[in-house]
């Protein structure tokens, strides 16, 4: 089961699991449309089932609803925590929708690690909401493109969901020294590989798989991903 770190904050408020469930139930009771997806996910995290249901994006086939074990979410958190050196009390900000895995995992990371998470309504243009320093944020390339002048406030910025174009990369690196491009999918509980992109690199650096992840190609030249800590089955894409 998922245990909340005592340092966890959501929008500047401390919550334990009971308080978070109460918060979610209240939002559903009053039909707070902006928080319904968040609230439903909170209730799912703390129910008695060992899994959550998550909708895939369709990158590995037809979009579908799959089961992800809660232990897999925890293992995914640990991979991210170790790679980006996330610690209790660090600040984070997210504008990702809570009905897909990337948004869900931002909350799970915050709860488990003990981050101070500023969770905002999903928007393609989050620029006006970034007005102070944050240690960690995950964005789509479009969100980053529309927030170019505010990226300096984010220490560790990860971009995923689609490829970062060369022009966008140049624009980002004109404002900050480093960002991280990620590769992953719903079936792997978000990213399993990361590429560090820095203005100081003379050549482009490749993606590197996270600890415990292995990749190969099959006879059809399809990518085969093995992440035993997240899923028992190999993923072919």
Enumerate the language-model features and the residues they cover:
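AMP-binding/adenylate-forming
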Residues: 69-75, 91-146
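Conserved ATP-dependent adenylate/AMP-binding module captured primarily in the ANL superfamily
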Residues: 1-31, 74-96, 123-135
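Conserved AMP-binding A3 loop
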Residues: 51-78, 85
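Conserved S/T- and glycine-rich ATP-binding loop of Class I adenylate-forming
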Residues: 56-59, 92, 107, 137, ...
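Conserved pre-ATP/AMP-binding loop-to-beta segment of ANL
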Residues: 37-55, 88-90
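Conserved ATP-binding loop and adjacent catalytic segment of the adenylate-forming AMP-binding
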Residues: 178-220, 229-234
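Alpha-helix/helix-capping structural signal
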Residues: 71, 142, 162-163, 229
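Gly/Ser/Thr-rich phosphate-binding loop
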Residues: 147-201
């Amino acid at each position: 089961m998922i245990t909340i770190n005592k340092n966890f904050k959501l929008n500047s408020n401390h919550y334990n699991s009971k308080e978070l469930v109460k918060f979610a139930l209240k939002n559903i009771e009053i039909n707070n449309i902006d928080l319904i997806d968040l609230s439903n996910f909170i209730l799912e995290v703390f129910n008695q089932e060992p899994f959550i249901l998550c909708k895939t994006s369709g990158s590995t086939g037809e979009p579908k609803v799959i089961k992800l074990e809660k232990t897999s979410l925890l293992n995914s958190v640990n991979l991210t925590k170790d790679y980006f050196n996330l610690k209790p009390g660090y600040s984070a900000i997210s504008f990702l929708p809570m009905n897909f895995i990337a948004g869900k995992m931002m909350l799970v990371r915050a709860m488990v690690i003990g981050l101070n998470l500023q969770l905002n309504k999903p928007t393609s243009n989050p620029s006006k909401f970034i007005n102070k320093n944050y240690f960690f944020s995950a964005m789509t390339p479009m969100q980053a493109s529309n927030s170019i002048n505010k990226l300096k406030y984010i220490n560790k910025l990860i971009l995923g969901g689609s490829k970062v174009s060369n022009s966008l990369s140049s624009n980002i690196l004109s404002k900050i020294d480093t960002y991280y491009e990620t590769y992953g999918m719903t079936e792997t509980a978000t990213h399993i590989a990361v590429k560090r992109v820095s203005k100081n690199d003379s050549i482009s650096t490749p993606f590197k798989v996270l600890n415990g992840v292995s990749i190969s190609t099959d006879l059809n030249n399809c990518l085969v991903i093995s992440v035993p800590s997240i899923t028992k089955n190999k993923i072919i894409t």
